[in-house]
Amino acid sequence: MEKIFLNGEFVSPSEAKVSYNDRGYVFGDGIYEYIRVYNGKLFTVTEHYERFLRSANEIGLDLNYSVEELIELSRKLVDMNQIETGAIYIQATRGVAERNHSFPTPEVEPAIVAYTKSYDRPYDHLENGVNGVTVEDIRWLRCDIKSLNLLGNVLAKEYAVKYNAVEAIQHRGETVTEGSSSNAYAIKDGVIYTHPINNYILNGITRIVIKKIAEDYNIPFKEETFTVDFLKNADEVIVSSTSAEVTPVIKLDGEPVNDGKVGPITRQLQEGFEKYIESHSI
C-alpha cells in the first residue's frame, strides 16, 4: 500500500489530512523540493535538501531536520512505495494557525509532507525537442526561494499550453530570466549563456549539473544576462529542470531556433547528464 510522509509518520493516502488553517493552504507560506529517482536511487539528493533548508532559512522557518535526516526519510519512502523511476515531492509550511498575515505567536510546529510519484523520463522531448514561447516575467522578486507561491509560474505555463508549447521562457523587460518551471539557456558560437544567480531565478540543481558537465566537456559557460532577441537568434536553446532534464527547444514563438533541429552542444550535455545520473544517484 502506498505511503505518504506526514509530520514524522508514514501514513496511507486516506490518512494524510491537513487542516484548512494550514498556512500553506491559506497563504502559500511554505517551501518545497522535487527530487528525481532513477533506478530506485535518489539523484543529487544532497544538493536538493541543502537548497530546501536554505529556502526554509530565507523565510524564517525552522524545520529541525538535517540534510541526512531528510535523505533517510526519502529513502524509506522510495523503498516503501517501490519507486524505480519517478520522483519525491516534499513541502514544508509554517504550520496550522488562525488566519493572520504575521507569523504565528507563539510559534507552531511546521507541517511537512512528502510523497512519491512513478513516471518515465521525457524521452520524446529529449530526442526531438519541444516548442517554447516567451512571456513577461510577472513573478515576485525572491525567485531564488523555492516557494509554494507559484501563481506567476502557473499563468506562464498555461500561456505556453494555450499556444501548443511545452515551456514558457520568461523575461523582465528584454532580459531573459528563466522558464516557468525550468532554467533557460542560449547557446551561441559554442558558448552556453544563462542568467546569473540572483533573486530573479532559482538556482536549479540541474543548472548546477549542466555547469559541471560544460566544464568537463570544455564548453564555455557564461552566467550573464541576455535579451529575448539574443535567445531567438541563438544556435541552440535548452531548458533544464529536475523533470525536464536537458530539453532542447527547437521552436520559439512559432519560429524555428536556428535550423529547427537539436544541436550538437545539447547532445553533449545530454550525454554528460547520463553519466552524471550514474555517478550521483544514491
From Swiss-Prot:
The modification N6-(pyridoxal phosphate)lysine is found at residue 146. The active site is at residue 146. Its cofactor is pyridoxal 5'-phosphate. Substrate binds at residues 32, 99, 101. It comes from the Bacteria. SUPFAM superfamilies: D-aminoacid aminotransferase-like PLP-dependent enzymes. Acts on the D-isomers of alanine, leucine, aspartate, glutamate, aminobutyrate, norvaline and asparagine. The enzyme transfers an amino group from a substrate D-amino acid to the pyridoxal phosphate cofactor to form pyridoxamine and an alpha-keto acid in the first half-reaction. The second half-reaction is the reverse of the first, transferring the amino group from the pyridoxamine to a second alpha-keto acid to form the product D-amino acid via a ping-pong mechanism. This is an important process in the formation of D-alanine and D-glutamate, which are essential bacterial cell wall components. Belongs to the class-IV pyridoxal-phosphate-dependent aminotransferase family. This is D-alanine aminotransferase. It comes from Staphylococcus aureus (strain COL). The gene is dat.
